[in-house]
UniProtKB/Swiss-Prot annotation:
Transmembrane segments: none annotated. Residues 10-206 form the tr-type G domain. This is Elongation factor Tu. Residues 60-64 are annotated as: G2. GO terms for cellular component: cytosol. GTP binds at residues 19-26, 81-85, 136-139. GTP hydrolase that promotes the GTP-dependent binding of aminoacyl-tRNA to the A-site of ribosomes during protein biosynthesis. The keyword Nucleotide-binding applies. It comes from Janthinobacterium sp. (strain Marseille). Pfam families: GTP_EFTU, GTP_EFTU_D2, GTP_EFTU_D3. HAMAP family: EF_Tu_B. It comes from the Bacteria.
């Protein structure tokens, strides 16, 4: 049978499976791909294809991740699944696979376990906006009351980490039954119910081009007779000639006006997300702008230097530190295009952080950076990456 051609018209959403080891994340991933390919077309993937996750590098860190695609009536999904707990930690902190929503897989037979809790906390810290729960292995629990108890436990745990535990969808089923072709309520029907929850509960993400204009400054030139040109790749939004913009970060915020946009030496009336452009600024001196700042829509982003974050510290094998670090450790924080020195405050109960650990920290930078919750950064020592992190909450 001929495969239908891939329709780019469907909105695209990124999701992933999270949860405790052996609760069935990979089996569920295979079941979703298999059941949906039967119903809506697309490629079915077996458990072995998914479990054998290829290595990839994100910010110099090796992560094993499997990528699976599937579609529903209304959407196209890209789904990530990681084999090991450490891969999840790295994946979520580096943002290698940004998730618009996550499917928390929890065994109905075991209930929430340590990694269930840790993945929920990580989701909160790195800004995963929506979680849907799949109570797996429901065929192994005969007692309806027990099933209800596990559901209550999971809801309470989610609420504890500020997710709407009472309101988010929970689907009960068996990924194994579904994968084996069982068409009953715990088999394929549960997978279709989960797909419906994905479609209805996770909103379509805003496209980059619809966001507020933001361009991280990579280089600054002065062109005689024309003024100052700032180059970089537009991260989100659109910039039109004649619009006011702000230069944010490192020093006091300045206002200026875009008098031209160039791409491949051609003049344009606008640039949009994804474009590598030169932006001509009116009345701005070359020394007023530097790498590490951003050009942004006025009022859309502010400079900050005090924040909490979640970091993963590279292990020795990954080229990281060989020794632990302690409170008040002062590395460089690499945001977008530049390094800023900052000091790290550890949680009260943490005396030191070992290579290979992940930990919540509070950071004080020496210079402010245009910052939002969810912004990724690298931690460096003398140009060498020793960790990766994400801004969890801005303090000031």
């Amino acid at each position: 049978m001929a495969k239908g051609k891939f329709e780019r018209t469907k909105p695209h959403v990124n999701v992933g499976t999270i949860g405790h080891v052996d609760h069935g994340k990979t089996t569920l991933t295979a079941a979703i791909a298999t059941v949906l390919s039967k119903k809506f077309g697309g490629e079915a993937k077996g458990y072995d294809q998914i479990d054998n996750a290829p290595e990839e590098k994100a910010r110099g860190i090796t992560i094993n991740t499997s990528h699976v695609e599937y579609e529903t009536e209304s959407r196209h999904y890209a789904h990530v699944d990681c084999p090991g707990h450490a891969d999840y930690v790295k994946n979520m902190i580096t943002g290698a696979a940004q998730m618009d929503g996550a499917i928390l897989v929890c065994s109905a037979a075991d209930g929430p376990m340590p990694q269930t809790r840790e993945h929920i906390l990580l989701s909160r810290q790195v800004g995963v906006p929506y979680i849907i729960v799949f109570l797996n292995k429901a065929d192994m629990v005969d007692d309806a009351e027990l099933l209800e108890l596990v559901e209550m436990e999971v809801r309470e745990l989610l609420s504890k980490y500020e997710f709407p535990g009472d309101d988010l969808p929970i689907v009960k089923g068996s990924a194994k039954l579904a994968l084996e072709g069982d068409t009953g309520p715990l088999g394929e029907q549960a997978i279709l119910a989960l797909a419906n929850a994905l479609d209805t509960y996770i909103p379509t993400p805003e496209r980059a081009v619809d966001g507020a204009f933001l361009l991280p400054v990579e280089d600054v030139f002065s062109i005689s007779g024309r003024g100052t040109v700032v180059t970089g790749r537009i991260e989100r939004g659109i910039i039109k000639v004649g619009e006011e913009i702000e230069i944010v970060g490192i020093r006091d915020t300045q206002k200026t006006t875009c008098t031209g946009v160039e791409m491949f030496r051609k003049l344009l009336d606008q640039g949009q997300a994804g474009d590598n452009v030169g932006v001509l600024l009116r009345g701005t001196k070359r020394e007023d702008v530097e790498r590490g700042q951003v050009l942004a829509k006025p009022g859309s982003i502010k400079p900050h230097k005090h924040f909490t974050g979640e970091i993963y510290v590279l292990s020795k094998d990954e080229g990281g530190r060989h020794t632990p670090f302690f409170n008040n450790y002062r590395p460089q924080f690499y945001f977008r295009t530049t390094d800023v020195t900052g000091s790290i405050e550890l949680p009260k109960d943490k005396e030191m952080v070992m290579p290979g650990d992940n930990v919540s920290i509070t950071v004080m930078l020496i210079n402010p950076i245009a910052m939002e919750e969810g912004l990724r950064f690298a931690i460096r020592e003398g140009g060498r990456t020793v960790g990766a992190g994400v801004v969890a909450k801005i303090i000031e």
